[in-house]
């Protein structure tokens, strides 16, 4: 059985890769009164008086929203939000297994930047962080920029920053192994999308100077050779 078929059968068996589990068993009437009404009113009052207490009195301190519009899912492309759900669930499972961070998959059925930004902003007070995932360029740049301005919690675009961090780490270690200097390397970035641009920005900030970036038309020699929507980035 190949890996695709094996994965499909596993997904049929599991009916999803994540679940919500109560951190306190509700076994008695007092448990119910403490975790829900009437006792829960007091934490609500405290948060109403001091917004920051929402990070102390709720699980918000450890909740991350993993959000996509389904337009750039893995190597599959624009397959829609529902079809992107298995990937979002998988990312949430990684958060939990490797960092003990509770993450929720959220798939937004819109390609409109304003709608996506407003939707995420309106639910942001339920979370401690936002992880943008598999949103096509150049729309992803604008969404991230605006959310960072609006939200009071960290906003991270995995396809940009996660990829850039991994590439930078690999190059640093490669330099250690080969004894070469960071600024002496000649680097080719094959692709000028979300990941490629983010990689270029990070490497330049770290002192890597000799960088050649290519897109579907070949080597990019000036801004004229970059597609109009991507130029500002």
Segments and roles (model prediction):
Residues 1-155:
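N-terminal ligand-binding/catalytic initiation module
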Residues 52-56, 120, 177-178, 199-203:
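A generic local secondary-structure boundary/capping motif
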Residues 65-75, 167, 183-204:
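Glycine-rich adenosine-cofactor-binding loop
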Residues 157-173:
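A glycine-rich, Thr/Ser-enriched phosphate-binding loop motif common to dinucleotide/cofactor-binding enzymes
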Residues 205-209:
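Conserved S-adenosyl-L-methionine
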Residues 213-215, 228:
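Conserved acidic E/D residue at the C-terminus of a beta-strand in Rossmann-like folds
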Residues 224-233:
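Single conserved hydrophobic/aromatic residue that forms the stacking wall/gate
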């Amino acid at each position: 059985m190949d890996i695709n078929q094996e994965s499909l059968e596993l997904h049929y068996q599991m009916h999803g890769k994540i679940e919500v589990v109560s951190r306190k068993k509700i076994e008695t009437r007092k448990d119910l009164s403490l975790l829900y009404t009437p006792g829960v009113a007091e934490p609500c009052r405290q948060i109403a008086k001091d917004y920051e207490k929402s990070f102390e009195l709720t699980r918000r301190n450890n909740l991350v929203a993993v959000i996509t519009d389904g337009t750039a899912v893995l190597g599959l492309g624009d397959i829609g939000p529902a079809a992107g759900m298995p990937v979002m669930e998988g990312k949430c499972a990684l958060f939990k297994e490797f960092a003990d961070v509770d993450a929720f998959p959220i798939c937004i059925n819109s390609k409109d930047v304003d709608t996506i930004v407003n939707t995420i902003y309106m639910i942001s007070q339920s979370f401690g962080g936002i992880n943008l995932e598999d949103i096509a360029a150049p729309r992803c740049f604008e969404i991230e920029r605006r959310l960072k301005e609006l939200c009071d919690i960290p906003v991270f675009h995995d396809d940009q920053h996660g990829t850039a961090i991994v590439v930078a780490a690999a190059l640093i270690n490669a330099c250690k192994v080969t004894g070469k200097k960071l600024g002496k390397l000649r680097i080719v970035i094959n692709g000028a999308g979300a990941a490629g641009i983010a990689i270029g920005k990070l490497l330049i900030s770290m002192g890597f100077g000799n960088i050649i970036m290519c897109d579907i038309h070949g080597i990019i020699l000036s801004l004229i050779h970059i597609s109009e929507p991507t130029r500002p980035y």
